[in-house]
């Protein structure tokens, strides 16, 4: 018997298994969806989330946040995980249009950067939950040095909102 028999038994077992049921991958997207359908579902979900985000933030609030960005000497953007990637992407876009912006995703470097900030600087912290201790410590430190904090976070009340000078809310739609 030995190894060849084991390989044969495994291949027979795999061949005799019924097709596995479709499993959910993300919201309405299922593992057996054709690629085009998965793409269409993803576009629909993202569009709905963007409209919900637009509707939850007033025009006045958007203008106030734009004014904060324009008046900042330096914009320090941060986030953890996927929010850090959003911060990095937004920093690049701000730099392209002439803002002094930098994304700091390493939390030790973030605290050092914020401690060396001035009252004219702005911390733009991105966190859907707003509960990450590192981001809230950075926000506290920015306020201590006299700077401002702009949070992009979820609508549910959280610690980051309490520290922020201004908040923009984002909506994630899960079903």
In which residue ranges do the predicted regions lie?
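HTH-adjacent hinge/linker in prokaryotic transcriptional regulators
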Residues: 2-60
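Short gly/ser/thr-rich secondary-structure transition/capping motifs
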Residues: 56-60, 103-109, 149-151
């Amino acid at each position: 018997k030995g190894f060849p028999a084991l390989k044969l038994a495994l291949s027979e077992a795999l061949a005799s298994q019924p097709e596995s049921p479709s499993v959910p991958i993300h919201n309405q997207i299922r593992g057996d969806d054709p690629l085009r359908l998965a793409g269409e579902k993803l576009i629909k979900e993202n569009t709905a989330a963007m409209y919900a985000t637009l509707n939850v933030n007033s025009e006045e609030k958007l203008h106030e946040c734009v004014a904060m960005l324009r008046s900042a000497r330096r914009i320090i953007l941060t986030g953890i995980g996927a929010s850090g990637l959003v911060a990095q992407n937004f920093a690049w876009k701000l730099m392209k249009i002439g803002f002094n912006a930098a994304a700091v995703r390493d939390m030790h470097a973030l605290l050092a950067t914020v401690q060396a900030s001035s009252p004219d600087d702005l911390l733009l912290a991105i966190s859907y939950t707003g509960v990450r201790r590192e981001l809230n410590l950075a926000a506290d430190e920015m306020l201590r040095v006299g700077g401002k904090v702009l949070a992009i976070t979820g609508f549910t009340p959280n610690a980051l909102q309490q520290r922020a000078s201004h908040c923009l809310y984002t909506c994630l739609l899960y079903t």
